[in-house]
């Protein structure tokens, strides 16, 4: 028993310095890397209070402004933004004076000068009445009624305004003014018409003005030859009563299709096969 106790004491005495040495080495290992790790983190991250300042305080504020609250800003700091860059001497004096513009004088019309409503719309403002000649105040339809000797006395720009609608109408050919069903024969179709049928080249409304005796002399196009489909619309209205309705109508895709024959529909019953009964019962039924 004594021998066992002695061996234990010897083992403890030998093991004590080894345990202390191991513990010291562990402390050294744990302390040094932690300090080095913190130094590496501090290189890239700012302290906590500086990180909070980035969110709650603008980075362009000065150090004095950071220490002050928003409610206790000095007056000169608050009003510095509102000061104008331009000095008062550079500003024009009109800003300090109210603009007094003369009111336009409205001259009331007398009882004789009262104009119809369509003319009043074209009359310019009252302050321009004295600078515009009287003929320009009239609408174009009334200006065209001037006689020839008065038109010569007009100025150049007045004559241009007067002749503008007539010049525009002259550019439009007569066949374009007519309706689609009353157009004149096209130039490429005039070659097919004989010279004795010159009156057929006239517009439809001019052909209808002819007396009845002369109308009979003019052979309609559909009697001279079989009309092509694209020339059916040229037939005048007084001759359409003698022509079938199908020949007067313009060409359409429906004309080329055959007529649909009406078929009487009759019911078509199919034999009923019941699932729950055999075929013999269905035949009896």
Swiss-Prot record:
Tissue localization of expression: Mammary gland specific. Secreted in milk.
Compartments, record wording: Secreted
Location (main, coarse): secreted
Modified residues (Phosphoserine): 23, 25
GO cellular component: extracellular region
Entry superkingdom: Eukaryota
The keyword Transmembrane is annotated on this UniProt entry: no
Modifications after synthesis and translation: Phosphorylated.
Record's keyword terms, sorted: Milk protein, Phosphoprotein, Secreted, Signal
Signal peptide: 1-15
UniProt similarity note: Belongs to the beta-casein family.
Function: Important role in determination of the surface properties of the casein micelles.
Protein's UniProt name: Beta-casein
